[in-house]
A protein has these predicted regions:
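Residues that define the transmembrane beta-barrel architecture of outer-membrane proteins
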Residues: 23-25, 43-47, 73-77, 115-121, ...
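Outer membrane beta-barrel transmembrane domains
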Residues: 168-203
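Short loop/turn motifs that connect adjacent beta-strands in outer-membrane beta-barrel proteins
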Residues: 20-24, 91, 160-171, 198-211
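Transmembrane beta-strand segments that form the barrel wall of outer-membrane beta-barrel proteins
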Residues: 28-35, 58-68, 90-98, 105-107, ...
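Outer-membrane beta-barrel initiation region
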Residues: 20-53
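Detector for outer-membrane/organellar transmembrane beta-barrel domains
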Residues: 109-180, 233
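Outer-membrane beta-barrel "beta-signal"
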Residues: 160, 195-197, 201, 222-234
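Cleavable N-terminal export/targeting peptides
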Residues: 1-24
Length: 234
């Protein structure tokens, strides 16, 4: 606690430029034509703000999604604590949704059988040419398996980034290994095949806007999506 307080004082007063340089802050917002997550349709046009801080591989970030055109879209607010060293990463995310077990959508209600929170742990490794990630829900409003018990819903993903024709691309394949109502699967199922392209549009000499398009297919649900979006970040 003393170290945290001292760090905050150093930032506020500017006593240590070196310490400030080591602390990374992220403030950004994505605007998307539809909210597609792991091959699932989670809503229509949305703004998705991000606020984060990182120090020597440890990061704490807040992320949200809020529908702009459909009042029925579920609001989301997530907190993620993560650590990265080299290519290895590990983290815990607290997802909160405005729809769930609590009809009053209370954020600070954490009852095991009455909360709108979902807690997920993840582990992964970035090999450079590709990255592997595994995610598992371990508490909160998780889905159910075929026996009607907590499914510990999991998702695994491989992503391959590459550059082609001055555009940054990412090809992704994701699957759900076990039956769960969270993803609507009865067993192992491929739920996410996507290809995303991102290009920065120069506005001024010091400001650019990343614009992206993404094709997403979900073989399990037999659905496909085309998403457009852009990012604002100072």
């Amino acid at each position: 606690m003393k170290k945290i307080v001292l760090m905050a004082m150093m930032i506020a007063t500017g006593y240590s430029a070196t310490a400030q340089d080591e602390i990374e802050t992220t403030v950004a917002a994505d605007f998307v034509s539809s909210y597609i997550w792991r091959g699932l349709d989670c809503g229509s046009v949305a703004v998705q703000p991000t606020l984060g801080i990182g120090y020597k591989g440890l990061s704490l970030s807040a992320w949200g999604s809020y529908g702009l055109t459909n009042s029925d879209d579920v609001k989301e607010f997530d907190l993620t604590l993560a650590y990265t060293t080299g290519g290895f990463n590990i983290g815990i995310t607290d997802y909160w949704f405005s729809a769930g077990l609590d009809p009053d959508a209370r954020y600070f209600k954490y009852d095991a059988h009455g909360t709108n929170h979902v807690f997920e742990a993840n582990i992964g490794y970035d090999f450079g040419p590709l990255s592997l990630q595994w995610f598992t829900n371990f508490a909160g409003n998780d889905g159910l398996n075929k026996n009607g018990k907590r499914a510990y819903s999991s998702y695994m993903e491989v992503a391959v980034p590459f550059r082609l024709a001055t555009v940054d691309w990412t090809a992704t394949a994701g699957a759900v290994p076990f039956a769960t109502t969270s993803y609507g699967t009865n067993g192992f199922a491929v739920t996410n095949l996507s290809l995303k392209a991102t290009k920065e549009i120069k506005v001024t000499d010091t400001f650019s806007i990343p614009v992206f398009g993404q094709v997403v297919g979900n073989p399990c649900s037999q659905n496909a999506y085309l998403v457009f979006g852009f990012t604002l970040q100072p």
